[in-house]
Design a protein with these regions (language model features):
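A charged, aromatic-enriched C-terminal amphipathic alpha-helix characteristic of glycosyltransferases
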Residues: 307-311, 321-359
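Conserved donor-binding/catalytic core segment of Leloir-type glycosyltransferases
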Residues: 178-196, 201-207, 212-213
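Membrane-proximal helix-turn-helix segments that form the acceptor-binding/catalytic region
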Residues: 79-83, 99, 106-107, 115, ...
Length: 366
């Protein structure tokens, strides 16, 4: 049986990719981030679902060492889960996991490595931040070039173009069959920073008596928690899609607003992965014109694209509450059309990677 191993972080619906990959070979998913988690998928069915373990590695230490311990940790996890057996393909995200995959390829533990690049951080800000981003950018370009293929979650990410076999990876939108009734709350998923404008959401929810659910955490969120309405529920960091889905099934609106909508913002280059989880539970989203995927949200009617100002955000939230069934139907149509392309991409690319002697691949998409 063919075997695929995924060494990833959390947030980009890696489970969806694992499910699609498992239709072509047994797939082991290793998620290594604020939460460590492992799964095994076979023929589109999850056969093992490991516990969620909150990691205690300091982000500051991880950044100072450029993720070196993460490379070692991913290699050790690979050996433990595969019992040292060889895999056919390793799909990785971030330079840390890709470096681990490239080492495993070098010693003969896998045939192919795919580097998945989820974001691009422009070297802007303070001097120390610019230096750090230039170094991590160099590492990402290096591992992308050395991989067999490089996939970017957005066509705006330039990093993967160092590899002649680069593609744009469309991410799956799940369907959790959430009910369309009983939608009275608002949901937010993420690691809040001042750019996320969650303080504006606090004000709007307080004004209209809306219950807000917050998944995620950050030092910034802790510093402004006192501004939240008293009925706000802070669920913390979790990777359990079932728990998240139970809450989002009560939400009529999701929030993905960014203050910085310039071409130099990190959100301009990535994909608003929180929107995928919201859409999986038929939750329309209020967002700003940042990522390339935002154009799809606007054209499909699956949400409202606004400027990051309170009046427009408030108006959009109230419109979604008043016309939720219209937005929900738009999400269903978007999911059907979008996922057809997602399945085709995974079937074509993973089949080619699993072949002993790969057939000529389709022309890479820039």
């Amino acid at each position: 049986m063919k075997q695929v191993v995924m060494l990833t972080g959390i947030g980009n619906n890696d489970r969806g990719t694992a499910r699609l990959a498992s239709e072509l070979g047994r797939t082991i998913l290793v998620q290594d981030g604020p939460i460590a988690h492992e799964e095994v998928w076979e023929n589109g069915v999850r056969t093992y679902d490991g516990p969620e373990i909150h990691t205690h590695e300091s982000r500051l230490i991880a950044e100072a060492t450029f993720g070196f311990m993460g490379i070692i940790r991913n290699i050790r996890t690979y050996y433990r889960l595969t019992r040292g057996e060889k895999s056919d393909v390793i799909l990785t995200s971030a330079y840390v996991q890709t470096a681990a995959g490239l080492w495993l390829r070098a010693i003969g533990k896998t045939r192919k490595v795919v580097c998945i690049v989820s974001d691009y951080l422009p070297p802007t800000g303070s001097l120390s931040l610019r230096i750090h981003r230039r170094i991590t950018g160099f590492f990402t370009r290096l591992v992308a070039r050395l991989s067999d293929e490089a996939w970017a979650v957005s066509p705006r990410i330039p990093t993967v173009k160092v590899n002649p076999h680069h593609f744009v990876l469309p991410l799956l939108i799940d369907d959790n069959h959430a009910p369309v009734t009983g939608r009275e709350e608002i949901g937010y998923i993420g690691f809040p920073s001042p750019d996320h404008a969650i303080d504006l959401l606090f004000e709007i929810c307080r004004k209209h008596g809306l219950k807000l659910n917050v998944f995620g955490d950050s030092a910034y969120l802790q510093s402004i928690k006192h501004l939240a309405p008293p009925n706000t529920v802070f669920h913390g960091i979790t990777n359990d899609t079932s728990k998240i889905g139970q809450v989002l099934a009560r939400c009529f609106c999701g929030y993905a607003v960014y203050r910085d909508t310039s071409p130099n913002s990190y959100s301009h280059f990535g994909v608003p992965s929180k929107c995928l989880q919201l859409f999986a539970n038929n939750v329309p989203v209020v967002t700003t014109n940042t990522a390339h995927f935002t154009q799809t949200i606007a054209s499909s009617g699956a949400g409202c694209v606004v400027e990051p100002v309170p009046e427009q955000i408030e108006r959009a939230i109230l419109d979604i509450r008043a016309r939720y069934p219209v937005y929900s139907d738009a999400i269903n149509r978007l999911r059907d059309s979008w996922n057809a392309g997602v399945r085709q991409f995974h079937r074509e690319r993973i089949s080619a990677l699993l072949e002993a002697t790969p057939a000529p691949a389709a022309q890479p998409r820039s």
